[in-house]
Amino acid sequence: MPDAPKSNSESLKKLYSDMLLIRRFEERAGQLYGMGLIGGFCHLYIGQEAVVVGLMGAAQEGDQQITAYRDHGHMLAMGIDPKAVMAELTGRSTGLSRGKGGSMHMFSSEKKFYGGHGIVGAQVPLGTGLAFANKYRGNKNVCLTYFGDGAANQGQVYESFNMAELWKLPVIYVIENNQYAMLSLIHI
């Protein structure tokens, strides 16, 4: 986890700095993608920076994160080196997954980041499993499990909610409503 700030003023500056880092990183990634220097897909996190930065500000050492394919911002907020993330995006061997995972499939066991996942909602049961492992091991860690509004209607998401409630698992489900999903209405 990133180092905790010492004062409220310092804390606010750190939050702003982290959000700005994510925004500028994503803007550059978008440029490189447009130039054809990033292969495959590149799902940007622009406009959602405050979600992960705010939650990381409350996270404790050892807490895990798992998310979908908009994962660059999560890694940066966890303190993963931006050069390693960019190296992965551009397919270099110095990337987090040795240049093989690209935008959607990065991973850092050292930072407890268990990846971005390309299948909508697939990370939710995995995050629930990480929470089960925390409970089984008796540690005090939680798993922050992020998903978008489009994944909110997937069956495995509701099954995960049910298991988490039945077993009182240490998981926080974070729905990032970026309004990209075509069939997830927030107004009637």
Regions found by a protein language model. Name each.
Residues 148, 175-176:
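Active-site flanking residues adjacent to catalytic metal/cofactor-binding acidic residues
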Residues 186-188:
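Conserved small/polar residues in nucleotide/adenosyl-binding loops
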Residues 167-174:
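A glycine-rich helix N-cap at a beta->alpha junction
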Residues 27, 35-167:
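Cofactor-binding active-site loop characterized by glycine-rich and histidine/acidic residues
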Residues 1-13:
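Charged, compositionally biased N-terminal leader segments and the immediate start
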Residues 20-33:
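N-terminal glycine-rich anion-binding loops that anchor highly charged ligand groups
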Residues 73, 179-182:
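Short gly/pro/ser/thr-enriched loop/turn and capping motifs at secondary-structure boundaries
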